[in-house]
Design a protein with these regions (language model features):
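Generic structural detector for well-ordered beta-strands
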Residues: 11, 35, 44-46, 69-71
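Generic short beta-strand
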Residues: 20-23, 57
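Solvent-exposed serine/threonine-rich low-complexity stretches and specific carbohydrate-binding patches
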Residues: 30-39
Length: 72
């Protein structure tokens, strides 16, 4: 996954169906959810609603959790 121009891009190397992705701003508890559609391998999330400043984020993909810091 990488961040660019207000969006998080998540690339899957194979098709993942019935996968739910959530990005949570730990500071504000803002959550952005996305359900992966059939055949979708590149997910683009607009995270502009998370707010400016340093965001401690949690990305949940099904049962896997990843943590990161974004400076917006």
């Amino acid at each position: 996954a990488y961040y660019q121009n207000g969006h998080i891009y998540i690339n899957f190397d194979r098709c993942v169906n019935n996968t739910k992705i959530e990005v949570t701003n730990i500071n504000t508890n803002s959550v952005i959810s996305h359900s992966v559609n059939e055949g979708e391998t590149i997910i683009i999330l607009d995270i502009s609603s998370l707010g400016c400043g340093t965001n401690y984020i949690e990305i949940t993909i099904n049962d896997d959790v990843f943590y990161g810091i974004l400076d917006l």
